[in-house]
Amino acid sequence: PAALAGWQFSRRPLRGAGPVLLLVLSVAMGMLAIGQSASWNRSQSDQADFGSGASVRLVGGQGGGPATAGIYGGLDGVRQAAPAHRTTVEASGGRTAEILALDTAHADEGMLMRSDLAGGSPRRVFDAIAPEPAPRPGFVLPKDGTRVKLDLRITTVSPKPSGSAVDPDEDPPVVTVLLEDRYGLPYRFLAGPVPVDGRPVPVSFAVSAAGGLAVTGIEVDDEPPFGQAQKRRVAVSDVRVVTGSDSPEGSEGSEGQEHPVPVSGSVRWDASMALAERGDSRPGEPPVRNGTSGLPDFTYDTGVENDDDWERTTSTLRITAARPKAAPLKAVATDDYLKKTNAKLGDEIDLTLAGNTVRVTLAESVRRLPTTGAAELSGAADPAQYGGALLLDLRAVTEVLARRTTATIEATE
């Protein structure tokens, strides 16, 4: 049959040209369609990776309480979670620049950044802005803890109280417990009023088992007494953690076992006193640490209220765990940012983060940063007013802001 077909084609060569050309055209169009489909799918995948920066991206805060700290990292099926804080700042020429502070140590997918955008390995870009590893401040709670319990007491040291230890007309000091999760994000728990009578006041609050929280200090807000300053002693003692609770929020009715939290005597604490009067703030007498137990224990001077002032003076005693000196902040800039701000690598710039001005060094540059550049995210109504983007390490940012009493930063995604 093959020989016969060949003989027929040789007798009439043009009769088979049409079917052959049609077959070739069909194969070519099929290959073109396959190539276009693969190219389109790859393009859509690249755009999706650039827009999300991770396999799953969740935009929106998780709440500011210690009971929700690190909650996404504890969900079933989640291998790793990296918090981020996104904001915008004014750039030169009325432009709007995008700022992304990301926990690069836990962003193990590298923002899904392509090597052609990073100019090499994306990990090299992250390493350029990551801080050096450092021990965590304060005392770290056990991983499976769902509730923290501790005792607070405030005692008048001098002058010694006569009669009733507590003046019923005076409002007691209000204490706030300061915490920090494994990402360096700060949390606050309002413990409430603590009478100045020397008796322990029990404090109990829920924490997230997935947060890796550490107690990093306390704040005592008060009003100085009239006529005469007092020496008072504030101390934290008997810190315990509840484990094995059946309730995800660690409620009182479903508690498990209590365990003491080990506190090393090597933990150091710093304390400062600030007095606010008529809108002005001034430092008070430096508090004095008592003992070496590893828990906050300080004697402080309350200051004195002037009878002639119609506006009450307020005081804040802030006790925080000692930290090593924060490393200088570094940033990765997009080519767009460098071009539109006339900046270059090695320049130092000032940025406003969480209401505080921080100094940042431009350490690396990339063509573009994933998750940045969209008008609805950058805040620039006109694309021409977009001023590029900067990437910072969230841990490095929180280390700098931790030393500023007015700074609070939250994860926005």
Where are these regions (language model features)?
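Juxtamembrane segments of multi-pass membrane proteins
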Residues: A2-A134
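Basic-flanked hydrophobic alpha-helices used for secretion and membrane insertion
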Residues: T68, R86-A91, E98-E413
